[in-house]
Amino acid sequence: QQTEKPDIIIAATHMGHYDNGEHGSNAPGDVEMARALPAGSLAMIVGGHSQDPVCMAAENKKQVDYVPGTPCKPDQQNGIWIVQAHEWGKYVGRADFEFRNGEMKMVNYQLIPVNLKKKVTWEDGKSERVLYTPEIAENQQMISLLSPFQNKGKAQLEVKIGETNGRLEGDRDKVRFVQTNMGRLILAAQMDRTGADFAVMSGGGIRD
């Protein structure tokens, strides 16, 4: 910041958003970071990890029943906007800013649903899944660009490297808290491959 003199700074994080910074057993998240920084020092924090559509119902309180396609007000802490587009590509987050006289102002924010559907039941009793918002068509140019990489990865994943008759435990509630046979197998493979004396991995970095 001192050498480059950027007009804006946007932080991309994976720390989680917790109402009013009440992170419980989790590590401190985006709210705590924004409060710890100089006021307005970031234009925006684009977060992840807690897998929330960060749309505020009131100050320091997220909307827990957000409906796709409806207005979404992002959080703001210490003059810093905090946004998060839920999980798994369900939304594209869009923030429009105006930059005038050295000042940034957010003029619009929305979560754009990516072909999300809801279940509706008609008068005849039949049920159907329908789109919340108009369908977003696939971009054929992008598919052509990315398909070779996807196919290459798929071919590598289909190579058989071993087999087991037992279950490799990868349940989130297990791998986050205790050692599992899957974790030990992965670490043993890493040690064998590299000739290391020991191996360490994050609890739950690889899971079901």
PLM features per residue range, with description:
Residues 25-158:
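Active-site-adjacent helix-turn-beta-strand microarchitecture at beta-sheet edges
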Residues 3-9, 40-43, 78-80, 195-198:
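Loop/turn elements at helix/coil->beta-strand transitions in domains of secreted/extracellular proteins
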Residues 13-16, 48-50, 86-87, 203-205:
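Active-site metal-binding loops of divalent metal-dependent hydrolases
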